[in-house]
Amino acid sequence: MKDKKDIKLNIFETALEIYSENPTKFSVRAVAKELNLKREEVYTHFPSKNAILRYFYQLCFEEYIKQTVEISEYSNYSLEEKLGHLVYTHIELFQNEKEFVERSFNEIIYKANPNNVFQKSLEEQVEKILN
């Protein structure tokens, strides 16, 4: 049996495929149908369809943090190097899903509530870099 994180990732990956093929066909129902799940099962992992899409941006921060932990000399990086690593890591990750980011970033992140997970994560990471 898959653990919660694996199920959540599977839901996200399926949603990403559906959204990338045709954003107008993207819905919790479509994701659930594709995975042979009940909609309620999808909602136990994500409160809304936009939350599924925002998960991509959360995963980007998780990958960034993982990379910083793996860099043994990261604590010795200058401010410029740390900020550069933050920016370039995200550019690289965004480039991997360029079409998705181009379609979703404006609505899901930029125009979203200023307290969304992406913006909070960005603020946390910049604060860590500055301190």
For the regions a protein language model found, what residue spans apply to each?
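Short, hydrophobic secondary-structure boundary micro-motifs
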Residues: 27, 102-104
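Alpha-helical DNA-contacting segments of helix-turn-helix folds
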Residues: 52-63, 68, 104
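Amphipathic, well-ordered alpha-helical segments in soluble domains
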Residues: 60-64, 93-100, 125-129
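Amphipathic alpha-helical packing segments from all-alpha helical-bundle domains
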Residues: 113-131
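Helix-turn-helix
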Residues: 10, 18-55
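N-terminal positioning helix adjacent to the helix-turn-helix/winged-helix DNA-binding module
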Residues: 3-14
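Hydrophobic alpha-helical connector segments
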Residues: 55, 70-100, 110, 120-121
